[in-house]
Amino acid sequence: MMIIATICFSLISVMVKFLGHLPVMEITFFRNIPTMLIIPLILKNKKISFFGNNKTLLLLRSLLSGFSAIANFYTITVMILTDAITIKQLSPFFIILLASVFLGEKIDFKKITIFILAFLGALLVVKPGFRLDIYPTAIALLGAMLTAGSHVTTRSLRLTDHPIVIVNYYGYTNGLISFGILLWQGNFILPDALSLFVLLLLGLVGLVGQFSLTKAYQMAPAKLVSFYLYLQIIFGALLGELLFKEIPDLFSIFGASLIIISGYLNYKLEN
């Protein structure tokens, strides 16, 4: 399930990059339309409660996921695709810390060492001091932390709520929030036919990705499942070069390699 989710999220990154001429809130709103239309029908057919059981945690998870998506969409539109995805992949290490605090999953010195290795890799990608504009990088790091929080809450919800309910909360909460902000900003751009097709496809792929991610975290420990997120770096590098002619520099390549290696080492420790 996590491999399916990873493929979906990689495709989402490419589509968001393509849609970079549109406002981020507009992209976010369209991302949630299929979820808001399809999921309620599935819930009704399966006779599952629309509002779920753990409403507070469901809402918290939706807000964390939604704002992490907004941060991710923004950084994808203004940064090299591989760099944006690589920084986002620090989220598994935040997951380790949060899972230790809130879920009681063990953490030891080896994991701390691996975390430091990943952090060094992130520094090579970010290259602090090499450029003046650090705002996109800060947003990317914030997005990684929010992503970690959403994944940990997803793991916590496994005992109380159905995966479809979790996805439904995500779609409605963030669809309504992004629509409200879009109205407030007043910068809606009417998409052309191709952009509209990509926007709708983005929503469908996002729906599959969210469901697969939620199901994966209900089936396995957060630390183990999060390893597969690193595949996005590889997919992002390949797709960024093929579709957008974006070639990461040596610092980014080496930094991404360190993050992937540290993710693999963490995976081996868990097994």
Predicted regions and their residues:
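Specific transmembrane alpha-helical segments of multi-pass solute transporters/efflux pumps
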Residues: 11, 47-82, 88, 204-220
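Hydrophobic transmembrane alpha-helices of multi-pass small-molecule transport proteins
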Residues: 110-126, 251-270
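Structural signature of hydrophobic alpha-helical transmembrane segments
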Residues: 22-35, 74-91, 133-146, 192-206, ...
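Helix-helix packing/entry segments at the starts of transmembrane helices
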Residues: 30, 84-90, 157, 161-173, ...
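Hydrophobic/small/kink-forming positions within alpha-helical transmembrane segments
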Residues: 6-10, 40, 62, 66-70, ...
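C-terminal transmembrane-helix exit sites in multi-pass transporters
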Residues: 74, 91-113, 234-253
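Membrane-interface interhelical linkers
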Residues: 1-7, 36-60, 109, 159-161, ...
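Glycine-/small-residue-enriched transmembrane alpha-helix faces in small-molecule transporters
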Residues: 1-26, 132-156
